[in-house]
């Protein structure tokens, strides 16, 4: 595939650094040969390494129009639905992933995704691995339908657990190892959620809304009820005037108007994710990540913790753990991904996986970037463009 040699896949100082191994680790299994409609990602990366020297690749990148690059966004928990990945088993890579997932997880993830029941799929311990695998299955679909999109990818970001999928796609983590880490993370977060009754409240506020003050008053109210060390804090920054507040939330629900909240809706999750109530999940995840081989990503991957690019393997290990108890800075991440000089064209953006929430958020963060947005569903549906909020 001649076009692949010019792809800016190895940005970020990754040129010539074991690219084939990174791509092979990405999927964690042997892959079909050249008889398929599109080459596998391992094949593509091997072609890239063999066909082009680093200096030539750099020169080509300098001449490349910014819009020719692509950005992939990976969704998080809450995007799952019964029936996702239906029909994707036609792709050998997807079949490989689900076969391996069953061995890693100890249960039939594909059947759970296709048939439910919904209550079981929505449990944190199940939906995080489900979204992780479904997102990478959507990448496999994209690679068969539009391989040039994958070839030209220059950056990736994932929302919460979606960050693991982004790092697998970028060659920093192996598929099986990352899935096991997601399993441990999900089970630990489920257990932490059950230990302390709590929740998450999605809020769209007016300009005068003061989220910190609202959270402070909510904590004081909890203390007056005898709750020790109550938690109520912003856990997700979605887009301007939209936040997710997590912790002990009844007071905020009952007093939404007082704090200039236009809309306040409880999310169907089991606990206060990305707050200190998730501290019991930190050590189990940290121990797993210590045992996993992590490499520098083959393209730019942005962290939820600070909205900046991952720099090296230790950086990834540290921030993936910190992310569990830190707010998701998604709005800030979108600004980092799409920051560019005035007049520079925006890249094509593909949300890969179930749901289109990240596209809706992107529209609110950066309308110009959203105009180049497409959604790659985790079913056999066609690729959809510009999903409206």
Model-derived regions: residue spans:
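A short, acidic, amphipathic alpha-helical segment used as a generic capping/interface helix at domain edges
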Residues: 325-344
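Alpha/beta catalytic cores of group-transfer enzymes, especially the acyltransferase/condensing modules
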Residues: 77-78, 169-324
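N-terminal cationic-hydrophobic initiation segments that often serve targeting/anchoring roles
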Residues: 143, 257, 293, 338-341
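Charged catalytic carboxylate motif
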Residues: 134, 284, 329
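A generic local structural motif
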Residues: 57-60, 143, 187-188, 230-232, ...
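Conserved strand-to-helix beginnings and helix N-cap segments that scaffold or border functional pockets
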Residues: 82-85, 125, 249, 278-282, ...
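FabD-like malonyl-/acyl-CoA
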Residues: 2-13, 17, 23-217, 345-389
């Amino acid at each position: 595939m001649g076009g692949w040699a010019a792809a800016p896949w190895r940005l970020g100082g990754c040129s010539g650094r074991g690219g084939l191994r990174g791509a092979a680790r990405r999927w964690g299994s042997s892959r079909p040969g050249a008889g398929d409609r599109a080459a596998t990602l391992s094949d593509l990366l091997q072609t890239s390494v063999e066909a082009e020297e680093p200096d030539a690749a750099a020169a080509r990148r300098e001449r490349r129009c910014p819009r020719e690059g692509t950005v992939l966004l990976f969704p998080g928990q809450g995007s799952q639905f019964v029936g996702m990945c239906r029909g994707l088993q036609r792709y050998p890579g997807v079949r490989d992933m689900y076969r391996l997932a069953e061995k890693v997880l100890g249960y039939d993830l594909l059947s759970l995704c296709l048939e439910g029941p919904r209550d079981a799929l929505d449990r944190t311990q199940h939906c995080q691995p489900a979204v992780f695998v479904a997102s990478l299955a959507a990448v496999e679909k994209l690679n068969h339908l539009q391989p040039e999109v994958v070839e030209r990818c220059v950056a990736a970001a994932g929302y919460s657990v979606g960050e693991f999928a982004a790092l697998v796609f970028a060659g920093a983590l192996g598929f099986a190892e990352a899935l096991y880490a997601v399993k441990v993370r999900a089970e630990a977060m489920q257990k932490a959620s059950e230990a302390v009754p709590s929740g998450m409240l999605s809020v769209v506020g007016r300009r005068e809304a003061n989220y910190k003050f609202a959270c402070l008053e909510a904590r004081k109210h909890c203390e007056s009820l005898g709750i020790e060390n109550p938690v109520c804090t912003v856990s997700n920054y979605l887009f301007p005037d939209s936040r997710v507040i997590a912790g002990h939330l009844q007071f905020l629900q009952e007093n939404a108007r007082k704090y200039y909240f236009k809309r306040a809706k409880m999310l169907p999750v089991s606990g206060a994710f990305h707050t200190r109530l998730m501290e019991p999940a930190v050590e189990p995840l940290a121990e797993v990540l210590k045992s996993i081989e992590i490499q520098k990503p083959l393209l730019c991957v942005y962290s939820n913790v600070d909205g900046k690019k991952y720099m090296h393997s230790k950086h990834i290990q540290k921030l993936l753990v910190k992310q569990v108890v830190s707010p998701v800075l998604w709005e800030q991440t979108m600004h980092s991904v799409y920051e560019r000089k005035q007049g520079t064209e925006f890249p094509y953006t593909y949300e890969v996986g179930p749901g289109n929430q990240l596209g809706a958020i992107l529209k609110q963060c950066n309308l110009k970037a959203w105009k180049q947005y497409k959604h790659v569903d985790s079913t056999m549906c066609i690729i959809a463009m510009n999903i409206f909020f």
